[in-house]
């Protein structure tokens, strides 16, 4: 969940 958003930002 969170990791997905983080990767999207990066």
Curated annotation (Swiss-Prot):
Expressed by the skin glands. The keyword Secreted applies. The modification Leucine amide is found at residue 10. One of its GO terms (biological process) is innate immune response. Keywords: Amidation, Amphibian defense peptide, Antibiotic, Antimicrobial, Fungicide, Immunity, Innate immunity, Secreted. Transmembrane segments: none annotated. GO terms for cellular component: extracellular region. Disulfide bonds: none annotated. It is found in: Secreted. Amphipathic alpha-helical antimicrobial peptide with potent activity against Gram-positive bacteria, weak activity against Gram-negative bacteria, and moderate activity against fungi. Belongs to the frog skin active peptide (FSAP) family. Temporin subfamily. This is Temporin-1Tk. It comes from Rana temporaria.
